[in-house]
Amino acid sequence: MTTYSETLETAAQQFDQAVKSQPSQLTVTEIGTVEEVQRGIARVHGLPHVQVDEVLRFAGGHLGYAFNLDPDQVGCVLLDSSDQITAGSRVERMHSVLDTPVGDQLLGRVVDPVGRPLDGGRSLDDLPREPCERDAPPIMQRAPVTVPLQSGLKVVDAMIPIGRGQRQLLLGDRQTGKTAIAIDTIINQLGRDVICIYCSIGQRSTGVARVIENLRRHDALDHTIVVIGADDAPPGLQFLAPYAATTMGEHFMRQGRDVMIVYDDLTSHARAYRHLSLLLRRPPGREAFPGDIFYVHSRLLERSTHLIQSAGGGSLTALPIIETEAQNVSAYIPTNLISITDGQIYLSPTLFRKGVLPAIDVGRSVSRVGGKTQLPAYRVVAGDLRLTYSQFEELERFARFSSQLDEDTRATLDRGRLIREILKQTQFQPLTLPQQIASLIAVTNGVLDGVPVDQLPTIERAIQDAVTSQANDLCAQMQSGKKLDKQQVGQIANIAAGAVHAHA
């Protein structure tokens, strides 16, 4: 018969075993309270240890992140709709910074900045994730830009060349063809081992759907990632979009691969940042933008570069798009971006109305880095082409005031008009290097002099077909990066002349 003390001792031992069998780790979670909600932002009380850019979970699983750290409250940017977030609801720290999925499984997908699929495809939760915000590569890890990025557009590749790792700005008034140039460049990367990322910021959903359909129709979606911060998305998601897209591109760059990213457009990005900053009572500056708007864009674009081999050896080429108003390129955001980037391509509404497509104003466009990467075949014609075209544009302005022109001036005007016609190009039809060189040699060597403008597109195609079929060795030489001598240029000009006579 057991005594009372033995029973008590047995119970104590069983209690000790039960306590030891339970997990001993306790989790401490900081819980805050929403004080105020406005469109895109919330003010939260009760998170004393929260950090900048830390992810916060609101009621219903909605996400946001810490943006302002004030002494008595936290200003949060919402990544989901604020309709279901009310004052008094709970907010929980996630102890992680904003991140986004990365990897090859993203190719061909349409996602939002935090990696949620928008195309109805499978979830991407199993992919590795990397922070959206990170420092740009240091100077000693950067290599010179030496390899060209072919756009497939004659006017760009010949006179405003782009290199892999360059930041080339596309700017112009709305509806002048900025996105069209970017999409043509993406299409032209098919088969060139370049991964493309199209980042839509504040654009209409119908316009983005049209872009995706065009990429799919031209077999360019398989090597492209589409990141969308639509116009009906919260401003915080629009602000985050380019940083998340850049993180996706940096992942491939560190693997030694070449990436091209299009930001369409950073004007909407700046407006989203202005919206958030004004709601969170950050001091406004010029045009009501916060004083750090330059830093916001520079820290984004400085992440695009060409890495040395020890750092990965890949490249990230940026094509940011900016929308100007009434051709005012000296406004605040355009001048900021011009000073940050390595060159700009300006699209003129005047040329657009004249039917000159792409409507690139060569005189106001420049590539400060790409000229060193241009393939030697272009250099045979690019210098004469730019000089002749610049003289033509200057003479054309003065010729309006005079009806009596000498023969040399008339010849320069006629040649300039031919060059302008030959630089026109239909959208979604990027040209190969031999096709471009054939057209440019034909126009600079006078082969097309006297050809009626209405017959020029047909004759140009005939010249391109003739050169690519009759001069295979020269085409291979151009593709390999070798220079053409005068005899070879003359050979191409003779083939072009034969094609012109055949269609006379």
UniProtKB/Swiss-Prot annotation:
Q: Would the keyword Endoplasmic reticulum turn up in this protein's UniProt record? A: no
According to its UniProt record, the EC number is 7.1.2.2
UniProt keyword terms in alphabetical order: ATP synthesis, ATP-binding, Cell inner membrane, Cell membrane, CF(1), Hydrogen ion transport, Ion transport, Membrane, Nucleotide-binding, Translocase, Transport
Q: Topology with regard to the membrane?
A: Peripheral membrane protein
Q: List the disulfide bonds.
A: none
InterPro entries for the chain:
Alt_ATP_synth_F1_asu (IPR017710), ATP_synth_asu-like_sf (IPR023366), ATP_synth_asu_C (IPR000793), ATP_synth_asu_C_sf (IPR038376), ATP_synth_F1_a_nt-bd_dom (IPR033732), ATP_synth_F1_asu (IPR005294), ATPase_a/bsu_AS (IPR020003), ATPase_F1/V1/A1_a/bsu_N (IPR004100)
**CDD domains named in the record:** ATP-synt_F1_alpha_C, ATP-synt_F1_alpha_N, F1-ATPase_alpha_CD
Q: Where does ATP bind?
A: G172, D173, R174, Q175, T176, G177, K178, T179
Name the top EC class: translocase
The keyword Repeat is assigned to this record: no
Q: Where in the cell is it found?
A: Cell inner membrane
MF (Gene Ontology): ADP binding; ATP binding; proton-transporting ATP synthase activity, rotational mechanism
Q: What cellular component terms from Gene Ontology apply here?
A: plasma membrane; proton-transporting ATP synthase complex
Q: Which reaction does it catalyse?
A: ATP + H2O + 4 H(+)(in) = ADP + phosphate + 5 H(+)(out)
Name the Pfam families on file: ATP-synt_ab, ATP-synt_ab_C, ATP-synt_ab_N
Question: Which family is this sequence assigned to?
Answer: Belongs to the ATPase alpha/beta chains family.
Q: How does it assemble?
A: F-type ATPases have 2 components, CF(1) - the catalytic core - and CF(0) - the membrane proton channel. CF(1) has five subunits: alpha(3), beta(3), gamma(1), delta(1), epsilon(1). CF(0) has three main subunits: a(1), b(2) and c(9-12). The alpha and beta chains form an alternating ring which encloses part of the gamma chain. CF(1) is attached to CF(0) by a central stalk formed by the gamma and epsilon chains, while a peripheral stalk is formed by the delta and b chains.
Q: What does this protein do?
A: Produces ATP from ADP in the presence of a proton gradient across the membrane. The alpha chain is a regulatory subunit.
Full protein name: ATP synthase subunit alpha 1
Q: Which organism is it from?
A: Rhodopirellula baltica (strain DSM 10527 / NCIMB 13988 / SH1)
Question: Lineage from the top down?
Answer: Bacteria, Pseudomonadati, Planctomycetota, Planctomycetia, Pirellulales
